[in-house]
Every structure is written in C-alpha cells, then in structure tokens.
Amino acid sequence: MTQRLKTLYQETILPKLQEEFGYKNIHQVPKLTKVTVNRGLGEASQNAKALESSLTELATITGQKPVVTRARKAIAGFKIREGMPVGVMVTLRSERMYAFLDRLINLALPRIRDFRGISPNSFDGRGNYSLGIREQLIFPEIDYDTIDQIRGMDVSIITSAQTDEEGRALLKALGMPFRS
C-alpha cells in the first residue's frame, strides 16, 4: 500500500515544483531521500536500562529497529571509553520514511505545547532540514505510563534539493508547519 504522503508528492507536489522552479526534467525536482532519527543518551550511557528503553521507544515511534551508536574514542571529561554506547539512531527510507513524516506532521507536531510552527531557519544550506524534539510523549504510540524519563530526539530530513529555497518549498508542500 502506497503511503498517503508519497501519493500526494507524486500526483500534486511534483508537477507543482517542476513548474515553480522551471525544471525540464522530472528527476531534477527535489524529493525526500531519507529521514534520520537520532537520540543521544548523554549521562544515561552508563545505564543499560536507559539504553533499552530508548531502543524500544524509537522502534515504536519509527517502526524500525534502531542501531546503537558507540563512542569512537575515549573522552575522560565525559567519562566515556571507546566502544561505549552513546546513542541510538534510525535511518528511514521509502515507505517507512513517508509513514513517519506523515505521523510527525499531522499527529506529533500539533501535540507540542504552545506550538506555533517550526523554525524556518534550520536548513543547512543544501536543502536538508533538522528538527529537535524535546519529549517523546508527542507521539501517540508512546504510552505515558511506560516511559521512565522524558528524553528528546533529533530528526533530520534529507532531500535531494540543491538549495534551502527548494527544500523549504518541498517541505511546505508536504505540509510541514513552518512559523511565518
């Protein structure tokens, strides 16, 4: 079954962006490449229970098993040794990416307290967007009673756009609620 957001992109957004930016070839039109969801464990890296809960929460939110990221080198100031788990990460592509973005845009972001839209300034200069989420409770899949601690996560939306303007137009067309 094709995702709702993917169908919307193929049927309406693609022709609109092609006309707006004057592309001759349909493959020049910016599209979503991947979405990465990352959570750094911080001081919880010493705690195996925190790692397990982060793994299950990210798996529940994204629908895909996260990979544990490990420290590349020891840093005494942070009490980290080489090979210690320092975070969890998921890379979403194709159907799961569209499903996650659909839930993020239409369900999770509107549930943030005092939400007025996301910052339009978080583009990286190449059309990719990064978003920080402060608490995992905004996702309807997470049960309030099962979490041990409120933790945030970073969501990076990677597009094939060449400029921030193209990336912003693509995400706005997909329904991303940018602050005016």
UniProtKB/Swiss-Prot annotation:
Q: Where are the transmembrane segments?
A: none
The keyword Disulfide bond is annotated on this UniProt entry: no
- InterPro entries recorded for this chain? Ribosomal_uL5, Ribosomal_uL5_bac-type, Ribosomal_uL5_C, Ribosomal_uL5_CS, Ribosomal_uL5_dom_sf, Ribosomal_uL5_N
Record-stated family: Belongs to the universal ribosomal protein uL5 family.
State the gene name recorded for this protein.
rplE
Sorted keywords for this record are:
Ribonucleoprotein, Ribosomal protein, RNA-binding, rRNA-binding, tRNA-binding
Q: Which Pfam families match?
A: Ribosomal_L5, Ribosomal_L5_C
Annotated GO biological process: translation
Role according to the record: This is one of the proteins that bind and probably mediate the attachment of the 5S RNA into the large ribosomal subunit, where it forms part of the central protuberance. In the 70S ribosome it contacts protein S13 of the 30S subunit (bridge B1b), connecting the 2 subunits; this bridge is implicated in subunit movement. Contacts the P site tRNA; the 5S rRNA and some of its associated proteins might help stabilize positioning of ribosome-bound tRNAs.
> Can you say what this protein is called?
Large ribosomal subunit protein uL5
Q: From which organism does this entry originate?
A: Synechocystis sp. (strain ATCC 27184 / PCC 6803 / Kazusa)
Tell me the subunit arrangement: Part of the 50S ribosomal subunit; part of the 5S rRNA/L5/L18/L25 subcomplex. Contacts the 5S rRNA and the P site tRNA. Forms a bridge to the 30S subunit in the 70S ribosome.
Q: Is Nucleus there in the keyword field?
A: no
What GO molecular function annotations does the UniProt record carry, in alphabetical order? RNA binding; rRNA binding; structural constituent of ribosome; tRNA binding
Provide the Gene Ontology terms for cellular component. Answer: cytosolic large ribosomal subunit
